[in-house]
Amino acid sequence: MMLHAQHMPGQPGAPSLVFLHGFSGDCREWQSVGEQFHGCSRLYIDLPGHGGSTAIPVGGFADVIRLLRATLISYNILKFWLVGYSLGGRVAMMAACQGIPGLCGLVVEGGHPGLQNEQARAERRLSDGRWAERFRREPLTEVFHDWYQQPVFASLTAQQRQALTALRSQNNGETLAAMLEATSLAAQPDLREALNALAFPFYYLCGERDSKFRALAQEVAATCHVIRNAGHNAHRENPAGVVDSLAQILRL
């Protein structure tokens, strides 16, 4: 089995870029950024429970990484960079720390490296469980209205919240809930030590108004790029700034 994806071929010899979206996003999320790198092969993946991969069930990160590997093989992508936002960033970090073959570099935007104690994990498990129950039972417009009131999204304007709520409400609540539980931050190990031992380039992007993830970026051995005029979802709020950072990283 493989994940649904959109593939755009590039020039021979150019790096392949594999883009992973955040929770409730889909393969279109990164395209405004990725399509500025038309010399590179670009693969935009729908994670399980999302977009064209809605019907693909997973029990945890191991299943997601296995599906990611199978998808890359199916497109004959043997050397690549992973670029992931939030949930996609956590999947990318997990894949990197598990030694996914062919990975040349890692770019994470607003991805958490992992909780550091059992109390924090227990609290997160309860919180994600409550959200999952709401995704299963309530209209998605109501759930996402509240979702985007969380502190991490404090920099969004009312208009941005409204647009995101409308966009994300096109999802399937049941499969979102299942993916939220399967890939909860509570189920993710603390990756700091493994990330600090990576043998290939690791870059971290965060919006200048995203104080939580700017602080987390200092806890891993990554080169940090702060995206101006942006909060947690920097590639949506300032795509040109993220394009500039990626161009520097990839030296294109």
Swiss-Prot record:
One of its GO terms (molecular function) is 2-succinyl-6-hydroxy-2,4-cyclohexadiene-1-carboxylate synthase activity. Gene3D superfamilies: alpha/beta hydrolase. It catalyses: 5-enolpyruvoyl-6-hydroxy-2-succinyl-cyclohex-3-ene-1-carboxylate = (1R,6R)-6-hydroxy-2-succinyl-cyclohexa-2,4-diene-1-carboxylate + pyruvate. Pfam families: Abhydrolase_6 (PF12697). One of its GO terms (biological process) is menaquinone biosynthetic process. Pathway: Quinol/quinone metabolism; 1,4-dihydroxy-2-naphthoate biosynthesis; 1,4-dihydroxy-2-naphthoate from chorismate: step 3/7; Quinol/quinone metabolism; menaquinone biosynthesis. Belongs to the AB hydrolase superfamily. MenH family. Catalyzes a proton abstraction reaction that results in 2,5-elimination of pyruvate from 2-succinyl-5-enolpyruvyl-6-hydroxy-3-cyclohexene-1-carboxylate (SEPHCHC) and the formation of 2-succinyl-6-hydroxy-2,4-cyclohexadiene-1-carboxylate (SHCHC). Monomer. This is 2-succinyl-6-hydroxy-2,4-cyclohexadiene-1-carboxylate synthase. It comes from Salmonella agona (strain SL483).
